[in-house]
Structure formats: structure tokens, C-alpha cells
Amino acid sequence: MDTDIALAAIYKETTKLNEKDAKIFSEAVQTALTVCKATAPNTRLKLVETPTNNFLLVTNVVPSETSKATTEANLNIDAALEKLASSFNTAVPVKSSKKYLLQNVRKMTSENIALTGSYIIYTKKHIEVAFLLDKSDFVQDILRYAETPSLLGHTDVRDLECLLWLAFCGPMSYCQADNCFGLNKAGYNAPFPILFPPCMYERNMNLSVFFGLLQIYVFSLYRDFSVENSNLQQGIKKRIKLVLSDLRAKERICEEEIGNFPLAAQICLFCALYRQNRLCMEYAANNLSMSVFSPIILKDCTFMQTTVTITQILPGSKEAIIFPVYDIGKLLSALVFSENGVLLKL
């Protein structure tokens, strides 16, 4: 039986229950959902497994099944969820799209120019994970919980290990700047890894969100990559082709979404900070009154040029946004590589 139709049929039957049974049904569903959220990721959805590998929430109310309910093809899950919500006597809030559209806007000027300069904060741990030469432990921690029923429906690729390898260890996962700071780093002498958003280096991040972002990043990095002309082994080439084929087959991985997504510029942290420093100085030299970029902030970092203060007074208020200028030389010296990993001495 189709899952959506069966689920919808059950929810439809709740409207026929008396007040007492409807209350019991409501409490049972709420309790089941609470238990799901409270359990570990690897056991979250393991309640009752059917022979067809589906997972069910069990309640103490079993509505009588009718042939009409099981054969009606026009039932859909959206309508069913609305009926369930109404049975809970809980109003469903209607949110305005403007709240989402202007979520990142700090102020609006009289000329209706949006200022979107929110900070991007990296911690010491984020940086150390980003510069790890061996990310095996980091990847294994992610894969340990990746094969869960709740995640598989949100992941578009079949080879998650290859997807992670492309992002963190693949040929396009290193800084593409011509004069990357890693080339002159003593004992390293190679391009640094490219910089991802801070959330990509957190081990406790929601895995569905993590892999959703990862798919977009990998597709943007490798969509023009020539697999056949690379020096990779044939087995790896085959796996890469499969991953890219899976990504291209999904409608949501499209040119419009890639064009509007805040993608990594394929540069490392130090090259990004260097460009940020130059941009900040240009703002100061030209006395510009607004900025639309989001500056990188290194939490608890003391390697800043204290003689340079770049601020932006927000129109119509006494608030100011500070754009830091970092001493890249000191920051680069504080990054220490060893056999045990990476240490950033802030």
C-alpha cells in the first residue's frame, strides 16, 4: 500500500473518533514524537519495522479501516496533516514570506539599500578541523550516523563516503589562489584546504542539513571537473562519476540555485582574510558609508591590527559594525602542524 495514502487514511479517520479517543490518539502521537526526539540518532526511528522496511509510530488507537479509505487515490499527506493539526485544536501559525526574505538584513537606508553585513564566526576548533591533513576520524564520525532511515530520504547520492572525500580530500578541495599562503608555509609547502562555513566543521550538526549543504558545495566545485583527464585511479573515477551523476539527476541541484547560493570562493582561510583586509582598507581609504559583505571573525583571536579601526555607522542609529584587520603573518605562525594533528596557538 502506498505510504502517503495509508497515512492519510489513518489521519482522516481521526475526525470520526469521539472526543475521548481523539484525545488519547493525540497524546499517543505526541508522546511517540517526543521519544523520537529524545533518543540517539542511531535509534531515533527504530520503533516498529514492517516487512517492507518501513517504520511506524504505534498508538493505542487503531481506527477501523474501510475499503474507501484504502483505495481513494486523491488522498495526500498535506491534507492529512491539516486534519491532524485541527484534531489537536492547535492553531497553525501563518508566517509572512517577508520575514524570511529580510532575515539577514540589519538595517534599511532611506534609499532602501539593504545592509547584510552579519559576522561569520570561526572558533579555534573550526580552524583546526579545517586544516587537518588527515580527516579520517572526522569523516568516520559523520558516516557512523549517516546510514539512518531519517537521513537516507534527504540524501541524493548513494556513495556518501565518496561525497565526503570530494569535499575534504578531493582534487578541488584545495585553495585555487595562485599564491596561496600554504605554498610558503614552512613544512607544509602546498595549497591549504578551501574554507567552508563554520557549521561544516561541527560534529554535532544536523546530518540532513549537513549533507544537503555538502551536495551543493561538491556539485559547484566539481561540475566542470574533468574526471577522465585526472590522475586518479579508475576505481575512484568511477565513484566520482556516480556521485556527480546522482547530483545532476536531482532537480533542486540546478543552475539557478547554485548561482544564488553563498558558495565558497575556493580559497583557504588565509587567502580569504587577506582579501578581507584589502577590502576593509579600501573602504577606509574611500570613506565608503556601507558594506554588503559578511566579514570573517576569528573568536578570541588577538592577532589583529589594533592601529586600524574600520567601522560602519548604521543609518538612523548609534550602532556600529566593526570590520577587523588581521595580522596574517602572526596568524600563520600560530598554525602548527604535527603528526598528532593541527594546533592553532591563539
Swiss-Prot record:
Highest taxon, organism lineage: Viruses
Entry-linked Pfam families: Herpes_UL95 (PF03038)
InterPro entries to which the protein is assigned, alphabetical: Herpes_UL95
Stated family: Belongs to the herpesviridae UL95 family.
Designated name of the protein: Protein U67
